[in-house]
């Protein structure tokens, strides 16, 4: 029984070490919402957070609703307190996807881009992170 428990524990840690955690980032966006019916009023400021994944060409894939209409966007790596300014390069609200670019290329040090595949089959195993 102890051997089985040890094997299960080791396999869980082995699985966790294969997860691409250094590809997942946290996204912070600031949106100001102007009231056009009462333009003399100050706009309401909203702070939104979400997650994204580093993809090829030093870009970040995220949900469009996280950055749609944002005046300011920052990204942060896992286990790093520093935030980096980012810009929305492409956005499609129809499919709820956006691609960000980070202005400081040092952000991508010690990260690995996720590989996107088109070869997905029914019943393939999938892990969601972020």
Predicted features by range, described:
Residues 4-13:
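Sec-dependent N-terminal signal peptides
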Residues 15, 42-43, 88, 116:
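Short, flexible, glycine/charge-rich loop motifs used to bind or transfer phosphoryl groups or to couple energy/partner
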Residues 16-54, 59-63, 72, 121-129:
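N-terminal activation segment of mature serine protease catalytic domains
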Residues 56-129:
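Conserved active-site neighborhood of the chymotrypsin/trypsin-like protease fold
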């Amino acid at each position: 029984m102890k051997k089985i428990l040890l094997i299960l524990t080791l396999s869980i840690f082995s699985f966790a070490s294969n997860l691409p955690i250094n590809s997942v980032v946290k996204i912070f966006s600031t949106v100001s919402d102007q009231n056009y019916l009462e333009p003399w009023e100050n706009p309401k400021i909203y702070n939104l957070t979400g997650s994204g994944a580093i993809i090829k060409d030093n870009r970040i894939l995220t949900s469009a609703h996280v950055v749609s209409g944002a005046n300011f966007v920052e990204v942060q790596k896992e286990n790093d307190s520093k935030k980096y300014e980012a810009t929305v390069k492409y956005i499609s609200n129809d499919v709820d996807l956006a691609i960000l670019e980070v202005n400081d290329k040092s952000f991508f040090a010690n990260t690995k881009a996720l590989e996107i595949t088109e070869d997905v089959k029914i019943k393939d195993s999938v892990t969601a992170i972020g």
